[in-house]
Structures are given as structure tokens and as C-alpha cells.
């Protein structure tokens, strides 16, 4: 607050879609850069793209007269942070994960301080540089919504338990399929609100057309309402989702994305499970029966549900 903020985002569709809700902010795009495996013939092309991104970042820093640069992760953050460091501008990197990414560990070497979402990540960096700040949540999450109002907004029943299912920004086809099978077993137990992602919306809508207790949406721009409406959440374990779960105090079944870099989502999920806020299950062994059993256990035991909510 009180500052001019310029947000550098990638050219990916998901970033463009998310930025539409914040038309008052200054968004600029930068090429998404992924570090290739070493050794690799792709290294030459990576080096060229990295050089261009650093040069672009230097010009942008001059244009906006930047006083501070904060990298939020990924190799796309490295060029502006490195360019700012070379220009003598204060630089920071923020990492929300229990296991920080390689890009952040590299970027941190040219940062004034490292900002952490959780304490468990400290030992991956220079401890003297680290400050545990937590992970920011969207403004809409700050004032928690009333459950009944949230359900009315999303056309969900007031007199039933609700399980919120979200597979991350890109959705999760296999997880969605398992949830659909579990939903058939749990028709008398709860309603389901499934956020599918754009790639799986049509398929899930068709498969659940005869299931009135399953509500399917492609993309949710009212996540505060979705969390408030839910009694329990089935989710991937990306840092942003977990931060929101903790802020909203929601019990969860966490299914880490199996192809996440360095399996960092599993590390995140273990932290929540160790604190009693969630159960963690691996996707390669997860069955619809497992999901149904979890929902039956948690939703039929009010004291267990309350305890998990409190631990979150």
C-alpha cells in the first residue's frame, strides 16, 4: 500500500486469466524460462533467452524506477532479480514451499533477504538472510465469508455437508476421475463442488450429469466463497492452496501433484499432515474407496473435523 507495483507475469494462459480480475494493477509479461537438464543441447538456447530476459528486465527497472524487486519463484524470477542486484537495487526472493525450488536457491544468492512461507525451508538458505513472513493471501480471503451466504452465492445446499475439490490452476484429470467415483459412493453423505480446470470441464460435466449432488465449475474467481462453503477440501498441495487452507482453517485430504519439481508438493503435504491439519495420500496408490473412506470418517466425526480445522 502506498507504492506503485508492477507485476511481471509469464505469457501463459493461466497467468493472463488470473490477472483479468485485477485491472487496476500494472501487469507486464516476460518470457517463461525453464532451466534445462545438464548436460543438454538446450543450454545454448536457454542462455540466449536468459540474456534477453535480463536485458529486458534492466530496461523495465529503469522505466518503472524500481526501488525494490521481489522474486516469487521459478527461473522466470531470476532475470529481474539479478538485473536489480547488478543495479544496486534491494532484492528479495519469497519461497512458500517446505522444499524450495532450485531457481529460488540460486536466486537467493543475489538477494538482500530471503522471505519464507514456513520455517521448515530455512535450512536450504543462508539462515542469517531468512525471515519467516508466511505466504500472502488474496484480499478476498482476509474477511472470511459466512458459510450460508457463500453457499447461496454458489447455489449449494444449506443443509448438506460440502466437499470442495480442486486440482490446482491446471486441474487434475486423474484426481477428478477418482473423486467422481467416490461421489457415487457418497451421495447420501455430502455434495461435491469440483473445480475442474479448463481442460477437464467438459468431460467431468458429462460424467456427472446424472449426479445432482455434484456441482462442476471450470474456474472459480470466488475462492473465498468456495472455501467458506466447504466443510472439507480435497486438493493438491501447492503452496498457495495450502496457505489458503490454513488461513480459512479447513481440514483437507492432500494429494500431491506427482510430477512437481523435486516432489516439493509431497514435502508441503507432510508438514500439514504432521500438524494434524490434513491427511496425505499418493496419487499412484489412491483409490476412490480411499477418498470415500476419508470423507465418511471426517464428515461423520464432528470432533475430528473440528480438530483438523483447528490444526490448519
Where are these regions (language model features)?
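Short alpha-helical segment that forms part of, or immediately flanks, the ligand-binding pocket
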Residues: 82, 224, 242-250, 270
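Conserved nucleotide-sugar phosphate-binding/catalytic loop shared by glycosyltransferases and other
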Residues: 4-48, 58, 133-135, 198-200, ...
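A short, well-ordered alpha-helix in the C-terminal region of glycosyltransferases
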Residues: 152, 304-312
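Short hydrophobic beta-strand element within catalytic cores of glycosyltransferases
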Residues: 235, 251-262
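Active-site-proximal region of nucleotide-activated glycan assembly enzymes
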Residues: 4, 24-26, 85-148, 156
